[in-house]
Every structure is written in C-alpha cells, then in structure tokens.
Amino acid sequence: MRVLLCGESWVTHSVHVKGVDSFTTSTYVEGAGQLRAALAGAGIEVEYLPGHLVPGQFPGSAEQLARHDVIILSDIGANSLLLSPDTFERSAVAPNRLRELEAYVRGGGGLLMIGGYLSFAGIEGKARYHGTPVEDALPVVIGETDDRVEAPEGVVPSVTAPGHPALAGLPASWPRLLGYNRVTAKPGAAVVVRCGDDPLIACGAFGSGRSAVFTSDCAPHWGPPEFLDWPGYAPLWVNLVTWLAGQA
C-alpha cells in the first residue's frame, strides 16, 4: 500500500528584540513524524511531501496521483495546490490540482484530510477548501470562515459507530483533544466519532473511491501528549488508510 502524505510542516520566523537592537531567526519543523512512523510500522509505504514542497511537487494529474492508494492532506491549504511555481511565478497555464484530486478519488482513490490551522476552512478562512472540488470529494461540508474550535480544557471524543473498520482494535476510551475544525457531515456520510455535536471522524464513498476526515490534528498542539501516546494512535491511522485504500 502506498500513501502520499502532504503538509504537516512549517517555518517559524522570529524577531528577537533586546533593548534597541533586534535580530531574526528561522526554524523549520516537521510535525508528521509520529504519523509516518505509525503507518510505516504497519508496512505501509509513505512518501512525504512537506508543505514547502507541495506547490512545486504535488502531482499534476489524476493519473499521477493514482500511483498512490491514498492521499493525505494535513495542515496544507488549497492555495498550495492551486498555485504551482509555473502559474504563480511565470503566469503559465497549469492543471487545477484540486480538480485532479477530485477526479482521482472519483476514479477509485482514497483521500484523507486531517485537521489543523490550514485544513478545511482554517484560521481566518485561509485554508479555503470551501466550494472546491476537494470539498466535493470529502464526506463533509466545509465552512467559509474560520472554523477552528479551540478547547484548551480538552474535549473527549465520543464513538458513534463502534463497528466501523476505522475503529477496529482501538481502546474504548479516548484521550482529550485540544481543538478541531468544525465541519458538517454530508447526507449519507458515516460519522464514526464526534467531538460534542461535531464530526471528528467521518467517512464516505465518492464515485468509485473513498474519503474520510479527522478534524483534529495528528500532532501538537491540538494533539496533546496523551493522544500521541495513546495505544490507539497508530492503529487509528492504519485503520483509516486501510479502509480508504479499499482493503477493509
């Protein structure tokens, strides 16, 4: 099984002010380590495309995407798929990769979107997946404005479809999460786990393919240590990817 994992990285640019002087530093961070390890530990081949490489290297056609059984978008906004260097820097005509991703799923591929500040609608609405072909392929409706639900006190997920393959072998009790993106399940979607009244995990069919969402994060800060260390962490992602690939 082959997975293309996109996003889940960032650069922090800091300004340090000391008296009348200031200087800047930059730090590059990848947050996908535990997710990648969970999938690799189950024998799943993971190709990782960090956020800064997505605009230039994300596949440009449904046929190229079909080399992978499942595509995962995690904390990477729609603009990074729409604006390739060819278009943004050289004004060249290029494929609409959101449409190609929709065609990939419709043709039999699997798509998972994981939540974060640049997922779904995202912070200040900047992820911008509302009204796109990717939203068409997902089992949820995405809002137009900032959809973050911050829960510093922690929110405990509740299982609503215990028999779904995504939950096979998982512990009955779930750890707290510190936030998620608020979405609405489409008619016919299976809402497997909720945070309050909102979907945390939703799954559905689209054309000949499958899609799913996990509306919280696979990494900090919405994913606290108790979630990352939870015995169900690795099985959850393996189950989701296996289901999306049509193997469960």
Where are these regions (language model features)?
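Short, surface-exposed beta-strand/loop micro-motifs that present aromatic residues
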Residues: D197-G207
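An acidic, glycine-rich "communication" segment
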Residues: E8-K18, A32, R106, G110-D198
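Solvent-exposed, acidic/flexible segments
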Residues: Y28-A32, R90-L98, Y104, A127, ...
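Short alpha-beta junction capping motif
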Residues: V3-L5, W10, Q64-I123, S208-F214
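Short glycine-enriched, charge-decorated loop/helix-capping segments at active-site entrances
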Residues: G19-T24, P85-R90, F227-W230
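Aromatic-Pro/Gly-enriched surface loop or interdomain linker
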Residues: M1-G77, I114-A121, P225, V238-T242
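Extracellular ligand-binding/catalytic regions of CAZymes and related secreted enzymes
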Residues: M1-C6, G110, A190, F206-R210, ...
